[in-house]
């Protein structure tokens, strides 16, 4: 799966066509009020570009929340239609389902350039292909899924996916369109361009920074990156498992991942074989409880962490070593913060690392922040626009970094 060879919306002829755009309008709601319109704003460039090309109609589709394959008004996209209309300064026709006669008639009788927003795709079990009933997974009927996909396909002449956050899901609206031209929107295209830059053709030295609690959860990620990077910073909770196994450091009550511990020697062996430098913390900010009001102190790895205390951030010496490693790199991928940044006493390691990667990005290097917690960090400290690329998809970016194919990307047409 080459990330850089996929058709984009700019390669399509959309004039006079019905254009289906799978967007990610999974916005946070407080009742019917949208608390952050960021995801709607992010989709505007693709929508506005298509509008300028005078399409017959634009059909927008998204999921919202987890309605579990049934209609639940709490997860209706109706409030999104109003917000989108305000942002586009143009009426948006909200349809009360995503398939069916009313939807088909509305789209086929569209006024030129009309913008439709379909109701939540996940109100139908056929979108995800299953639902949970009493804790058990119940699969959708195969014929019903095929029909649902045919109904969605019948609303369009061309298909555009601009929802990177769900590109790792083989859902009907992501892989179910029987149309000849299937392209990436600007948002998805930017994601692919940056991940291709790092994973297919990085400017070296290439550094990956990993945080997170468990080695076992990140095993595929580490294993795949060891074939690609020149250096690897390991921070966060999983650093303690590495320190314990490799150096027999006293880690007190810090996170220890017994399953992950068995995998550490193999990973280190692979790093040596591939000439990858692994950088681990050498000192820690520790707390006597997992809380913002914990008592804190700084200890070195030689001193060890006493019983009853846990490591919740890296210490000043580690911050210097991490910053020096960042300063050497030309391509950086960061997935997972090095400390519990949500608590002020344990946020300094994350802040220092963020300063270092921002400086690197500003100096013209490529810095990619994977979605999830690390993207939250970039937003919290207001540096999103100072970093080459902050990914919009936690799960999808993780799977790309693990070396997996994303169904939604594989499904797109290749450039001729």
Swiss-Prot record:
Positions that bind AMP: 213-214, 218, 237, 311, 342
Molecular functions per Gene Ontology: ADP binding; ATP binding; metal ion binding; phosphoglycerate kinase activity
EC number(s) given by UniProt: 2.7.2.3
Sequence positions that bind ATP: 213, 218, 237, 311, 342, 373-374
SUPFAM superfamilies per record: Phosphoglycerate kinase
Domain of life: Eukaryota
One term under GO cellular component: mitochondrion
Keyword Ribonucleoprotein belongs to the record: no
One BP annotation, GO: glycolytic process
Residues binding (2R)-3-phosphoglycerate: 23-26, 38-39, 62-63, 65-66, 121-122, 168-169
Protein task: Catalyzes one of the two ATP producing reactions in the glycolytic pathway via the reversible conversion of 1,3-diphosphoglycerate to 3-phosphoglycerate. Both L- and D- forms of purine and pyrimidine nucleotides can be used as substrates, but the activity is much lower on pyrimidines. Negatively regulates the biosynthesis of acetyl-CoA from pyruvate in the mitochondrion.
Name of the molecule in the record: Phosphoglycerate kinase
Organism (species): Kluyveromyces lactis (strain ATCC 8585 / CBS 2359 / DSM 70799 / NBRC 1267 / NRRL Y-1140 / WM37) (Yeast)
